[in-house]
Amino acid sequence: MTTSKRHYHITTFGCQMNKADSERMAGVLEDMGFEWSEDPNNADVILYNTCTIRDNAEQKVYSYLGRQAKRKHDQPDLTLIVAGCVAQQEGEALLRRVPELDLVMGPQHANRLKDLLESVFDGNQVVATESVHIIEDITQPRRDSKVTAWVNVIYGCNERCTYCVVPNVRGIEQSRTPSAIRAEMEELGRQGYKEITLLGQNIDAYGRDLPGTTPEGRHLHNFTDLLYYVHDVPGIERLRFATSHPRYFTERLIKACAELPKVCKHFHIPFQSGDNELLKAMARGYTHEKYRRIIDTIRRYMPDASISADAIVGFPGETEAQFENTLKLVEDIGFDMLNTAAYSPRPGTPAALWDNQLSEEVKSDRLQRLNHLGNLKVAERSQRYFGRIEEVLVEDQNPKDQTQVMGRTDGNRLTFFSGDIKELKGQLVKVKITEVRPFSLTGQPVEVRQAIPV
């Protein structure tokens, strides 16, 4: 089949892992000769990379898909793909709901997109949701940025939080080898990328599934050692990582982050609830006291560290007193960013079957109250930036003001300042902060730090 001047469009829902998967699948499509189309209505292949963490994200997918399914009646050569977590969860049921679909593929099959599409082009309707070993990516991803990049270090999750569908749809933990991770990072350094975010659903579990143990009996490979191993990759100026689990977040890792200058002093560590009974019901494997000790240890080693987190309100059986324990934790810690959600029952999870579900009214009320407090604390934390000089990695032009560029501080705060994107993109610029807002900063450029050439 010829693919000259044929176009594709990918719409991505959900987490950073999905965004990284979409970049890899875009790379596969471009290797096959397809060109990107910003407008899905001009595309010959439309791929929805989906999220099932909450019901509203899942329903949005069906809304988008319905519009394109109607289009296919007039354009039968249109290829429709649902990838990601909804595809994995629903499998062949998706074909019954949307018979116009050509390909349903779970996240473990992202690197197999070419083979799956070739089967579709041969006239088959394909479902690929079986559990497989994730093959190393042999295709260069089409990355959305030329400055920052995602690098997967571990796929899947072995945790069994009672509210979470991720282990069901992303499979068991599969760690990449340190050499494969470093090789990808070295190539990114040669291409001029400056910042890499190492990704995993539970990144602190890295290496547990790889062979080998030390003489002391611990796993031969672990995430802390990986940070030391990749820290000196030429050309890479910054390292971030996500997402962490409090159960596995160690003082040794904290110490490494404090010692390694390229590691950004920003930590995303979900706590989900500030109440121990709820944490036990969620099967999170830690207490709020342990979570607080982790944050205290981070701030002891790195007093100015930026901390972000996730929290759930309205978990089955949550009492007002238990919810207030979550409010107290947020008040006491003071997060730099707080992602919140009302509990959403997900198919195949234990908590979805419990008979102590809360009303939507209670969940909505608690979500509003938590957001109000969280935003107040974020605004308080932002005030410390005023008048300081922060180093900002310039990523792009401010879409709302063409005279400004934008980037992020070491602590992951979005920052705007005057400048020419053609001169500054990918540069580290010292910026004096002159205006603070809860979620962003504005400043004046002071000095451009010249990166060491690769």
From Swiss-Prot:
Please list the residue ranges annotated as the TRAM domain.
Answer: 383-447
Which keywords does this chain's UniProt record carry? 4Fe-4S, Cytoplasm, Iron, Iron-sulfur, Metal-binding, S-adenosyl-L-methionine, Transferase, tRNA processing
Q: Enumerate the InterPro entries for this protein.
A: Elp3/MiaA/NifB-like_rSAM, Methylthiotransferase, Methylthiotransferase_CS, Methylthiotransferase_N, Methylthiotransferase_N_sf, MiaB_methiolase, rSAM, rSAM_horseshoe
Q: Where does [4Fe-4S] cluster 1 bind?
A: 15, 51, 85
User: Where's it mainly located?
Assistant: cytoplasm
The Gene Ontology biological process annotation of the record reads:
tRNA methylthiolation
Q: Where in the cell is it found?
A: Cytoplasm
**Which cofactor does the UniProt annotation name?**
[4Fe-4S] cluster
SMART domains named among the record's database cross-references: Elp3
Q: Where is the MTTase N-terminal domain?
A: 6-122
User: What is the E.C. number?
Assistant: 2.8.4.3
Residues binding [4Fe-4S] cluster 2 are: 157, 161, 164
Q: Any idea what job this protein has? A: Catalyzes the methylthiolation of N6-(dimethylallyl)adenosine (i(6)A), leading to the formation of 2-methylthio-N6-(dimethylallyl)adenosine (ms(2)i(6)A) at position 37 in tRNAs that read codons beginning with uridine.
- What family, per the record? Belongs to the methylthiotransferase family. MiaB subfamily.
Q: How does it assemble?
A: Monomer.
Q: What is this protein called?
A: tRNA-2-methylthio-N(6)-dimethylallyladenosine synthase
- Source organism per UniProt: Nostoc punctiforme (strain ATCC 29133 / PCC 73102)
Give the encoding gene's name: miaB
